[in-house]
């Protein structure tokens, strides 16, 4: 039980299901939240309040100014108050609706409302019937908590004794729902919609279009202008973006006087917002375009030239403007049979002969932009890397180029001529750092090695004992 009175109003918490009986006429049980009280005798607040303790507070009764509480000689009066029963008292907390703590700042409240309003906007949740209700609840909560006066009143009395449409100094019963159109509230705060048409505002909630583009390795590394087919919302070609059917006229909007803006009274505040009748155009379309239906924009299939920046990677997504819209393109880069990529660096293999590895020389390697002359130092080992600075991929978010690393691979022949085999056997005789054995070479007791007689005689017949072969020269070079 609670009672609060002032010179202007009296707020009494009435017990249900039955009001206290008064001699002459008794109060009837409330029907559908409406109470009619006919009082024909003296009424005092203590006597009336004492009868409420048995049932407990369940309803709100507001007695308006001019009611005599201690006694009156004038005719019986009628006090009729529309109110909700215990259900409104269980309304979800505004702070919980916005997901903010009770001590949240105005910046936090605005940020929470913005994020949730975008998430539950009816235009982005057309298949969810509860989205519109949730969107309205968010507007209702933000309308109260964004006003410091209303917020203090809500913190003190809660939704049961607060009317968001009233001013900070006036109290009345709870009406429920926001006093401003949720759509208008959203536009006013976050729409940036003072001079745009309603069709343009709708595009804010369109899902971004995503496309996949196939690229070769070289196209991704060096960049390319590639023609691409997209479906985008662009200016309607039939009405040229005007929205009305060609040959027809538009009507002046009398709702906003042609200004495109309307004034909304929200109690102690006056708010200027986009006209709900014409959507900010200042005019009404009588005969909408049959293609865009008055929006001024229509979905069109267009072939556009997409400038692919040099250095994009596989799976990378970029945002590109196309007409008045933006699209997202995810690149799928094919693997190269020559190059391997590591950021801005590329790697490739270069096969050289045994002679090139031993004696050194030059070789030609395929580069990303041109053929590269590679210098092979003597004694090059397999898998040794040779760095070619600045021959890699452009750095997409920086300056300069990556490097090209060439991995040396020594190509060993699978088949030898008799001459080549004899020369290799001659070279193997003088090798001392061999672990294991070599076919055709026999180890001696002193630790040296000699060719087998059959292999040696055959080699001498073909090569000639007095002829110095290629590998013999190599042997002298390494043993001298």
UniProtKB/Swiss-Prot annotation:
Annotated Zn(2+) 2 binding lies at 253, 256, 275, 278
UniProt-reported outcome of changing residue 121 to Q: Loss of modulation of apoptosis
Ranges for the CXXCXGXG motif repeats: 236-243, 253-260, 275-282, 289-296
UniProt membrane topology term: Peripheral membrane protein
**Which GO MF term does the entry hold, naming one?**
Hsp70 protein binding
| Modified residue annotations for Omega-N-methylarginine | 58, 238, 293
Tissue expression pattern: Widely expressed with highest levels in heart, liver, lung and skeletal muscles. Also expressed in keratinocytes; expression level and distribution is altered in basal cell carcinomas.
GO BP annotations listed: activation-induced cell death of T cells; cellular senescence; mitochondrial DNA replication; mitochondrion organization; negative regulation of apoptotic process; negative regulation of canonical NF-kappaB signal transduction; negative regulation of cell population proliferation; negative regulation of programmed cell death
Residue numbers carrying N6-acetyllysine:
134
Q: Where are the zinc fingers (CR-type)?
A: 223-301
* SMART domains with a match to the protein in the record: DnaJ (SM00271)
Please report the stretch or stretches of sequence annotated as the J domain.
93-158
Is the Repeat keyword given for this protein? Answer: yes
Question: Which SUPFAM superfamilies does UniProt cross-reference here?
Answer: Chaperone J-domain (SSF46565), DnaJ/Hsp40 cysteine-rich domain (SSF57938), HSP40/DnaJ peptide-binding domain (SSF49493)
Give the location in the cell.
Answer: Mitochondrion matrix; Cytoplasm, Cytosol; Postsynaptic cell membrane
Q: Which residues carry this modification: Phosphoserine?
A: 398
Compositional bias (Polar residues): 443-456
Q: Which residues form the signal peptide?
A: none
What this protein is reported to do is described as:
Modulates apoptotic signal transduction or effector structures within the mitochondrial matrix. Affect cytochrome C release from the mitochondria and caspase 3 activation, but not caspase 8 activation. Isoform 1 increases apoptosis triggered by both TNF and the DNA-damaging agent mytomycin C; in sharp contrast, isoform 2 suppresses apoptosis. Can modulate IFN-gamma-mediated transcriptional activity. Isoform 2 may play a role in neuromuscular junction development as an effector of the MUSK signaling pathway.
Specify the protein name: DnaJ homolog subfamily A member 3, mitochondrial
What does the record give as the organism's lineage?
A: Eukaryota, Metazoa, Chordata, Craniata, Vertebrata
């Amino acid at each position: 039980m609670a009672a609060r009175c002032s010179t202007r109003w009296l707020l009494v918490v009435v017990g249900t299901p039955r009001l206290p009986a008064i001699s002459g006429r008794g109060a009837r049980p409330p029907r559908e939240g409406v109470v009619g009280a006919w009082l024909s005798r003296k009424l005092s607040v203590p006597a009336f309040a004492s009868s409420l303790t048995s049932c407990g507070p369940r309803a709100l009764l507001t007695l308006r100014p001019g009611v005599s509480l201690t006694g009156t000689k004038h005719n019986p009066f009628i006090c009729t108050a529309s109110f909700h029963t215990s259900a409104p008292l269980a309304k979800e907390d505004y702070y919980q609706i916005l997901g903010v703590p009770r001590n949240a700042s105005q910046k936090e409240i605005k940020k929470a409302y913005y994020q949730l309003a975008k998430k539950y906007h009816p235009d982005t949740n057309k298949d969810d019937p509860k989205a519109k209700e949730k969107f309205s609840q968010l507007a209702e909560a933000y309308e109260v908590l964004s006003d410091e006066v209303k917020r203090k009143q809500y913190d003190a009395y809660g939704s049961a004794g607060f009317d968001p449409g009233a001013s900070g100094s006036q109290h009345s019963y709870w009406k429920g729902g926001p006093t401003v159109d949720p759509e208008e509230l959203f536009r006013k705060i976050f729409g940036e919609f003072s001079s745009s048409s309603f069709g343009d505002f709708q595009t804010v909630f369109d899902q971004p279009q995503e496309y996949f583009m196939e690229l070769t390795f070289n196209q991704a590394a060096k960049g390319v202008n590639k023609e691409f087919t997209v479906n985008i919302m662009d200016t309607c070609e039939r009405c040229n973006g005007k929205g009305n059917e060609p040959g027809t006229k538009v009507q002046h909007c009398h709702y906003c006087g042609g200004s495109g803006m309307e004034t909304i009274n929200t109690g102690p505040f006056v708010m200027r917002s986009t006209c709900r009748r014409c959507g900010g155009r200042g005019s009404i379309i009588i005969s909408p375009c049959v293609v865009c239906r008055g929006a001024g924009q229509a979905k069109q299939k267009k072939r556009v030239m997409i400038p692919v920046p040099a250095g994009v990677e596989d799976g990378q997504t970029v945002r590109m403007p196309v007409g008045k819209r933006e699209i997202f393109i995810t690149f799928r880069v094919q693997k190269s049979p020559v190059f391997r990529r590591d950021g801005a660096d590329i790697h490739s293999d270069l096969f050289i002969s045994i002679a090139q590895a031993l004696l050194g020389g030059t070789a030609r390697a395929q580069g990303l932009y041109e053929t590269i002359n590679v210098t092979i130092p003597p004694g090059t080992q397999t898998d040794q890397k040779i760095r070619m600075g600045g021959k890699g991929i452009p750095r997409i978010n920086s300056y300069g180029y990556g490097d090209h690393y060439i991995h040396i691979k020594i190509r060993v022949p699978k088949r030898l001529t008799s001459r080549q085999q004899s020369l290799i056997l001659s070279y193997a005789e003088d090798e001392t750092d061999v672990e294991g054995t070599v076919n055709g070479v026999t180890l001696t007791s002193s630790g040296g090695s000699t060719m087998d007689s059959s292999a040696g005689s055959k080699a001498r017949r073909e090569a000639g004992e007095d002829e110095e072969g290629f590998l013999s020269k190599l042997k002298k070079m390494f043993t001298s």
